[in-house]
Amino acid sequence: MDTVTSKELPTLGLGLHFEDLPVGRAFRTIGRTITEPDIVNFINCTGMTEVLFTNLEFLKHESDIKGRLAPGSLVYCFAEGLLVHATMQKTGYAFLGMTLAIENPVFAGDTIHVEVAVTESRRSKSRPNRGIVTTLNRVVKQDGTTALTYTPTRMIKARGTGEG
């Protein structure tokens, strides 16, 4: 260690480049358990204070949903958080759009992970040092059920311009 400077050490945890994301590449993230404090903090931070998320008596007696329900937007945000740590540090330039479908509820105590498959990948015509990548992302609960799916398109840093 004495002969290696800090700047010479490789940095772990950096994102994937455009060239690392060809069509067909697939991977999954680590898991993350959704807790009751996560839900309470999220609904208070976002102002999503509808009774479905804030009133346990309503859930017990007036709703067919039983248990502390997580808003779909919380599940999406946590999925993106799992992906940022795994794939986009210093390489993600822009979020360009997506479609999203909520398929099953997530409750406090559920653990989610994200399964990702690259469906489109091309070098940007106007910015050849970047790529445009679309993925199919499935947020999966511990029992194997899909909570939500979404298809983000992102601008990702490339290692080079693709010339030469």
Feature-to-residue mapping (PLM):
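HotDog/MaoC-like acyl-thioester-processing domains
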Residues: 1-22, 102-111, 115-164
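Hot-dog-fold acyl-thioester-processing enzymes
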Residues: 2-97, 159-164
